[in-house]
Amino acid sequence: MDGQGSTTRISFRNDYSEGAHPRLLQALAQASADQHPGYGTDRHTAHAVALIRHAVAQPQADVHLLVGGTQTNLIAISAFLRPHQAVIAVDAAHIATHETGAIEATGHKVLTVPALHDKLTPALIRPVLAMHGNEHMVQPRLVYISNSTESGTLYTRAELEELSGFCRANDLLLYLDGARLGAALTADGNDLDLPTIAALTDAFYIGGTKNGALLGEALVIVNPALQPDLRYLIKQRGALLAKGMVLGAQFAALFEDGLFFELAAHANAMAQRLRAGLLAAGAHFTSDSPTNQQFIAVSAQQAAQLALRHGIGMRGQFEEQTIFEQRRK
């Protein structure tokens, strides 16, 4: 049965419609049996932070465990920018399309550009900088990217190095949304890793919600200039979780023995198995995604038939074709 009470043979709806991996639930059960100080000052959170610092090879990184992706983006971006400053992102970026104007609600404009495969490049950013050169317009200050992207594509090491160098040369901050960073780092063809991402960005987050956790994202701030006083803003935004051990226990379990990457690799493998079968059946994919996100174009009639039997997310409808987004865990 799906969440609406109808019979569903297989659900491809998303990678976060179930609870959590059993090992994370076990870690939570064990942690909940003890008494803990609140607001992320517990031993589980301290252990998780140490593990993440080790994984990203940044012992001085500031690590904050938060509940969800929109919350993490809002807190990070609003903290990093002055009131007159803006974000540059692709037009399909999550902060520009699926976060209900959360960034704009903090007073920061999101400047969007169309991009091939949903990836930003220096060539796309230069015109934005040229158009915003004085105090009569917002000042571009932060470049927002995601890996994997909204269409499941990946940044290569060379692309991220070029983008990072451009940002540093132009006094721009580089922030990476890692809601599906696990899927990106374990996908076929990927040549990035956590230490490289940490070295090339000012801040990024590691997504747990869409990678087997009950909830949770780990915000990693590498740039020391962006680190002071963030807990004040987290509290002010209502995001300082009283039962912080709920996040700490999960991220400790994810990073103690490689479970984070194990779960991501499994999701990718299942998605590629699905993709191979659908390609053999003649399906048309709108994106060449090596991750657990797969996008398929079908007719309106096919869409209706599929929706009756399977849980599948609809991404959009264009000229009698419906784009279905299928995700595997």
Model-identified regions with their sequence ranges:
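Active-site pre-lysine segment of PLP-dependent enzymes
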Residues: 157-165, 169, 180-203
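Hydrophobic beta-strand scaffold residues
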Residues: 87, 110-111, 174-176, 285, ...
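Conserved N-terminal alpha-helix of the aminotransferase class I/II PLP-enzyme fold
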Residues: 21-69, 91-96, 102
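Conserved C-terminal alpha-helix-loop-beta "cap" of PLP-dependent enzymes
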Residues: 82-83, 272-329
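PLP-dependent aminotransferase-like
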Residues: 80-139
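Active-site C-terminal subdomain of aminotransferase-like
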Residues: 144, 149, 154, 191-291
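Active-site phosphate-binding strand-loop segment of PLP-dependent enzymes
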Residues: 12, 120-178
